[in-house]
Amino acid sequence: MKILLTVPVTSFVSDPPNFPDLGLGYIAASLKNKGHEAHVRDWNMDPSHEKFKVWLMENRPEVIGIKVFTKDVAATQKTITIIRETLRGTTIVIGGPHPSASEPTDLMNDFVDCDFAIRGEAEESFPFLLSEIKNTGLKDAKPEKERYKNIPGLVWRKGGDVFSNPISLCHNLDNIDFPCWEMINPKDYFFDMLGSTLKEGYISPIITTRGCPGKCCFCCVHKISGRKIRYRSPSNVLKEMSLLYNKYNVKKFMFMDNCFTSHKENLIKICEDILKEKMIIEWDFVSYEKLDNLTDATLSLMYRSGCRMIHLGIESGSEKTRKVMNKSTSLKEITEKVKVIKDNGIKVGAFFMIGFPEETIKEIRETTNYAFSLDVDLLKFTICFPLPGTQNYDYIKEKYKFSIINWASFNIKDSPYPVSQLSSKELNRMLNVISLRLCLLNARKIVIRKIMKAVRIFK
């Protein structure tokens, strides 16, 4: 079957896409392995409804899979409308973070014109669904429950009823095909790694694990990939890195998984194998969890193998707010770890959010003061967004006394349901003040760097 895998056609709600979508790449590889003709299109690279219509008419895919983030619900609804107007007989399947975290009935009510949703990991489910559609036809008279009952994570409707199957996860990640890199080629994206000194080569995301045991109040990743961490073997990771390095000229890697450093032996083996293979690369990663494995010895090895930056998901500088978030690492530990990382030559980025449940101006000021006190190379602030499947989502349902949320009304910068004691307008005002402070700080750093460079030149 001919399949289009895509994101919704949308104007940039937050940041434009900087690098390939791993999820679509994994699904494309799975479909290709089953003999399907898969196409991946990132319409955020050129968000034109007219070009989308032309592509649909010229290629006429039989099935279209759309990856949906909560911030893109309205754009997805519009994209589905365009598909229905252009290709009436096409089967539409939605998947990704928002469907995975949403209640099945609420989800299908929000997307009345889609045929199916897949929750959780779809490498097995999507080909299974296509096989069922191909063999029996979408309008087959066979009872709905019998036709689809064995497809993990599937959600579908029949008349006024919505049916759903339990999510199933792949436990041996080495058995999953690498993403279909020829369809999500890193050379098509224009992005550079912060802290990088390499002047050549492309940048690519990669993951080494799935799942996260964390219970952060703002995160729904456990709804997609579970709480148990599943690991790829270091040899499997290096095999994919070598493919990207040798075939696609990738010299910079971003490890995107939540728990990259959770298995110390795997982390060390990956670093040692990079050195053994003599790969001239640079890489970074984000750490949302405990920092115990980032010791002096490990950080030294990481630096020698190419690690140039570590992004820390600190989120808040208020101990009170951190308890609400279910973060167990203390601010004292974080401050000490930042110094250890920097002492080993690795740059540090820090992510913070404002607007947590019942957070006041006092706690937000504690966060900003702590953030600006850290010796880090990058600071980034965002507003906490109540995603489905999170404790924050349950909190706003109780606070605002409703059972159904109009996700299409959500905007990543202006939620109609703020979770803190501040309104969306007040939170945005505070974020603007923080952004101005960041600009002044960055300008100061640039001036200092130029002065130091001039001093070295004239010595």
Q: Can you say where each PLM-predicted feature lies in the sequence?
A:
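N-terminal [4Fe-4S]-dependent radical SAM core
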Residues: 4, 11-12, 151, 157-205
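C-terminal accessory regions of radical SAM enzymes
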Residues: 4-13, 153-158, 162, 362-459
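Glycine- and acidic-residue-enriched helix-capping/strand-helix junction motifs
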Residues: 12-24
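A general structural detector for well-ordered alpha-helical segments in enzyme core domains, enriched
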Residues: 27, 52-55, 75, 79-83, ...
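Glycine-rich beta-alpha loop elements in corrinoid/cobalamin-binding modules
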Residues: 30-169, 383-385, 389
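Residue-level signal for the nucleotide or nucleotide-sugar donor/cofactor binding architecture
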Residues: 47, 121, 171, 232, ...
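Conserved C-terminal portion of the radical SAM core fold
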Residues: 47, 63-65, 91-93, 238-241, ...
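Radical SAM [4Fe-4S] cluster-binding motif and immediate context
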Residues: 179-349, 369
